[in-house]
From Swiss-Prot:
Gene transcribed to yield this protein: rpoA
Sorted UniProt keywords: Chloroplast, DNA-directed RNA polymerase, Nucleotidyltransferase, Plastid, Transcription, Transferase
EC number(s) on file: 2.7.7.6
General function of this protein: DNA-dependent RNA polymerase catalyzes the transcription of DNA into RNA using the four ribonucleoside triphosphates as substrates.
Highest taxon of the lineage: Eukaryota
Domain notes: The N-terminal domain is essential for RNAP assembly and basal transcription, whereas the C-terminal domain is involved in interaction with transcriptional regulators and with upstream promoter elements.
Species assigned in the record: Coffea arabica
Subunit text: In plastids the minimal PEP RNA polymerase catalytic core is composed of four subunits: alpha, beta, beta', and beta''. When a (nuclear-encoded) sigma factor is associated with the core the holoenzyme is formed, which can initiate transcription.
SMART domains reported in the protein's UniProt record: RPOLD (SM00662)
GO molecular function: DNA binding; DNA-directed RNA polymerase activity; protein dimerization activity
Protein name: DNA-directed RNA polymerase subunit alpha
Location of region: Alpha C-terminal domain (alpha-CTD): 265-335
Amino acid sequence: MVREKITVSTRTLEWKCVELRTDSKRLYYGRFILSPLMKGQADTIGIAMRRALLGEIEGTCITRVKSEKVAHEYSTIAGIQESVHEILMNLKEIVFRSNLYGTCDASICVRGPGYVTAQDIVLPPYVEIVDNTQHIARLMEPINLCIRLEIERNRGYLIKTPQNFQDGSYPIDAVFMPIRNANYSIHSYGNGNEKQEILFLEIWTNGSLTPKEALHQASRNLIDLFIPFLHMEEQNSHLENNQHTVPLAPFFFHDKLDKLRKNKKEIALKSIFIDQSELPPRIYNCLKRSNIYTLLDLLNNSQENLMKIEHFHIEDVKEILGILEKQLVIFLPKK
């Protein structure tokens, strides 16, 4: 085994990329180091970063397939080499790169004989395929294969259940995670009480994003989780009267929204959807999952209601207010 010489900073804490490679269209690898760290810090950061990489980054997958000619998932179609189940498993493996919010539709319509691959999928412009050569099916005879697909951007897993089945529609167990694996190791250096640590972080992705992009997204997600702690009032930071909560710094969302609500009659808020606003993807997805689709829906929610949304923070509420004020000015009729 050849020892690798790596130069690390002895003063300023910094990330450094020491290796990047593309093993295939669907397998990227990156290795990074963070140093110098005090004893124990590397393990803290390594655990948090690995969990954020594997659980917090969104990916895009096919989640449902519909075809009128299919009797059930385990049937076969005359003239096609693969069974319906095998075709579904092949579609499950297709890797997408997208700026998709929520779900969208796609389709395949080809005529045999010949091979059906990922490049035969007709997609909206904001979704693209990472590897066009991925195999889907082989048509042995001059027959038509037409299927409709539902594509979704999400995080984690989506396991199909009996309630998910619809007529002629077959859900697919989706693995949205674009990170194939993430590992970290810790190396110590120095003597005595001056021992320091280097954190090595390895990231494998499915090709829909690079290891550098994955590291950036995971870091951003972790920062978002800790932002509320930075806005606590210093004078209220200790627990008083046996209270077990620490109040956030006051942000008078309601007062500002009242001024905006006065303009309701002048603006068709019902017809202005939140995807027309300049909302960041994470905020948009959080609102949509809470059935907030229009600016009217948004204005009818209090700060307290918004803060109850999963993964929502006070900074998100402030950002929404800024965008709302800008948006309402844009849509106000000129006098």
